[in-house]
Amino acid sequence: MAGHSKWKNIQKRKNAQDAKRGKIFMKLAKEIYVAAKEGGADPEANSALRLVIEKAKGANMPNENIDRAIKKAAGGQDGSSYEEITYEGYGPSGIAVMVECVTDNKNRTASNVRTAFNKNGGSLGESGCVAFLFERKGFITIDRTERQIEEDELMLDVLEAGGEELRIEEDLYEVFTEPEHFEEVKTALESKYLISSAEVTMLPNTYAEADDQAVEKLETLIDVLEDDDDVQEVYTNYRS
């Protein structure tokens, strides 16, 4: 029976991993759909689509799933139509929270997001209530432990590529760009350096502090939101 129990545990874990992977692929498919719908189905002519395809491949999303999402956006397949919508609100201790969604039913999504806030010490706010606390930026990190890097040379490379700022952390170099220059900076740097991560994201320009109890509630709120099929990204201005 012990062997049978072990097999059941392995199978349960595998099923959970499969479900998690399926959720990731579904969210990526929505992101691909929106990028293709807004900028066209040709990745060569659509930088947003090109970047999300790269992101999807990095998550080992099958090519047929990627192609299906693009064809759907181009009108080659029937199905639901998705749109982007961002919700803003306050978490525990007044921490600013932004929730980026892609949905085919705004009423359902708004209800789910509002419930998540209400049940976890927060409140959903009006559009614009916290957006001013964030700025959309290209954000690239470079591993500084893998090999020796001349910081002056890296700074020059960042600026010449069109980057905005270089920050030095303990294990990483952080490169900031305007969103429109993100891809060219990333392409220039990855030919010479080991890039750990690269994304266009929302970065806080003001940070909030919170006690342990509020942080625990905030983490639960983020988990609940991220588990929602319609939610793509959750941003906060909490300083960890």
Curated annotation (Swiss-Prot):
The keyword RNA-binding is assigned to this record: no
Name of one Pfam family that matches: TACO1_YebC_N
Annotated localization: Cytoplasm
GO biological process: regulation of DNA-templated transcription
Keywords attached to this entry: Cytoplasm, DNA-binding, Transcription, Transcription regulation
SUPFAM superfamilies cross-referenced by the UniProt entry: YebC-like
Any GO CC annotation of this UniProt entry: cytosol
Any one GO molecular-function label of the UniProt entry: DNA binding
InterPro entries named in the record: Integrase-like_N, TACO1_YebC-like_2nd/3rd_dom, TACO1_YebC_N, Transcrip_reg_TACO1-like, Transcrip_reg_TACO1-like_dom3, YebC-like
HAMAP family recorded: Transcrip_reg_TACO1
Family in the record: Belongs to the TACO1 family.
Protein name: Probable transcriptional regulatory protein YrbC
Phylogenetic classification of the source organism: Bacteria, Bacillati, Bacillota, Bacilli, Bacillales
Designated gene of the protein: yrbC
